[in-house]
Amino acid sequence: MNERDDILQAVYRVIKERKGASADSSYTASLLQKGIDKILKKLGEEATEVVIAGKGGKREEIVYETADLFFHTLVLLGYYDIDPEEIYAELRRRFGTSGIAEKASRPKE
């Protein structure tokens, strides 16, 4: 794991610790206890804010909103007990493969 991954893993560990905590103790515990629909709603809101920030083109806003999106994505992963390492592994698998080849390798539905 490199230095950039460390902060994501550290945040994920805190999210996992908050999973069983009282909803009164933290925003994260409260969000996790409200359930998947609330988590997904918040994730959608944050994704929209990234889009708006991207359209505005202000670097600080893009960074700020992307950090929120990363955080709420980690909350989703924590809810389902998916370690970020699984995402890193999938990205490593795709790295160096063209998007067209990667899409062609997906199972047909």
UniProtKB/Swiss-Prot annotation:
EC number(s) given by UniProt: 3.6.1.31
Protein name: Phosphoribosyl-ATP pyrophosphatase
GO biological process: L-histidine biosynthetic process
Keyword set, alphabetical order: Amino-acid biosynthesis, ATP-binding, Cytoplasm, Histidine biosynthesis, Hydrolase, Nucleotide-binding
GO molecular function list: ATP binding; phosphoribosyl-ATP diphosphatase activity
Reaction catalysis annotation: 1-(5-phospho-beta-D-ribosyl)-ATP + H2O = 1-(5-phospho-beta-D-ribosyl)-5'-AMP + diphosphate + H(+)
Native source species: Geobacter metallireducens (strain ATCC 53774 / DSM 7210 / GS-15)
GO CC term, one of those recorded: cytoplasm
Compartment(s): Cytoplasm
Cited InterPro entries: HisE, PRib-ATP_PPHydrolase-like
Family: Belongs to the PRA-PH family.
Chief location: cytoplasm
Pathway: Amino-acid biosynthesis; L-histidine biosynthesis; L-histidine from 5-phospho-alpha-D-ribose 1-diphosphate: step 2/9
